[in-house]
Every structure is written in structure tokens, then in C-alpha cells.
């Protein structure tokens, strides 16, 4: 993912009912470090308030399921969106002191990693969502084909047991 010039990087450790956000300027200065509820209006307010500082990049640790709302709100607010994969997150966490795993620490690591090592980020774009939907539909087709084959083979087996001369 290419990030270009980003003025504010928001690391968002997503959760089921609440998230923790850590926003940093390009200089590394933390300008926001608070929990956020899973609420569209409050997410939008934070994103738009931080846009006063310039271009905003929102980086999440989980782009699907519980991370879908912050991503949708960030896109709608005009923010860039990125994703820090789990393996990159774990490796980045090893670079920071301490071993405790807290939402605040994770949000800080996400933001700082996105700011200092943008090559670790993955794009969260709509094409990936379409591709995921197509993979799911393709999986359904595979399941249906396997079920049809299984049914035909079972029917053939039962008919052969009843009337063996059908095998010829």
C-alpha cells in the first residue's frame, strides 16, 4: 500500500463493543489516545476532527467483521484506510518495550508502525471485498457440485444393490 504524504495516522485496535484509537502526527506526536465506542457518529466525529490536521490514514488490525464499521465510516469521511496484518503486528510489537497486551498499547503500535513502516500495510479496498464475495460464491458452487455428485453416486449404489444387472 502506498501512503504518500500522510499528516495524521490513526491506529485503531478494534473490539466488539469498543475500539481504542491512537492518532499521531507525522512527527510522532500523539494527538489522540482514547477509547471509542462502536458508534458511527462518534467515529465520524473523531475522523473529521482529526482531518483538520491534514490527510488522515486510518489503520485497523481487523478489516472484516468488527472492523467493518470503522472502515466504512473512515471511507465515508474521506480518510485513507489500511490494514496491518497480524504477523506484521506481532513482529512490530516485539520492537517496543513491555510485554503487556492492552488495547492502548496495540493502538499505539498500529499507528506508529503505519507511520514509520508503511510497507507493512495492506490496502483495504472494495476490490478485495468483491473478490471475497466471489470466492464465497465459488465455494457455494463447489459445495453444490460435490453434493450433486454424492447424491448421484449414492443413487447408483442403491440401484445396483436392488437391480445388479444395471451395472452392465
Residue ranges and their predicted role:
Residues 1-168:
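Phosphate- and other anionic-substrate recognition elements at nucleic-acid/protein interfaces
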Amino acid at each position: 500500500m502506498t501512503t504518500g504524504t500522510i499528516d495524521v495516522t490513526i491506529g485503531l485496535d478494534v473490539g466488539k463493543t469498543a475500539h481504542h484509537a491512537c492518532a499521531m502526527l507525522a512527527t510522532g506526536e500523539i494527538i489522540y489516545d482514547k477509547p471509542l465506542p462502536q458508534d458511527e457518529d462518534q467515529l465520524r466525529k473523531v475522523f473529521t476532527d482529526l482531518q483538520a490536521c491534514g490527510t488522515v490514514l486510518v489503520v485497523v488490525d481487523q478489516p472484516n467483521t468488527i472492523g467493518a464499521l470503522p472502515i466504512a465510516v473512515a471511507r465515508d469521511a474521506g480518510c485513507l484506510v489500511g490494514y496491518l496484518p497480524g504477523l506484521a503486528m506481532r513482529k512490530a510489537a516485539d520492537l517496543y518495550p513491555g510485554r503487556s497486551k492492552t488495547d492502548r498499547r496495540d493502538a499505539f503500535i498500529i499507528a506508529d508502525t503505519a507511520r514509520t513502516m508503511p510497507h507493512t500495510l495492506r490496502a483495504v479496498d472494495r476490490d478485495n471485498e468483491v473478490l471475497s464475495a466471489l470466492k464465497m460464491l465459488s465455494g457455494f458452487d463447489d459445495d453444490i457440485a460435490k453434493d450433486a455428485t454424492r447424491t448421484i453416486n449414492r443413487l447408483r449404489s442403491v440401484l445396483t444393490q436392488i437391480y445388479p444387472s444395471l451395472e452392465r
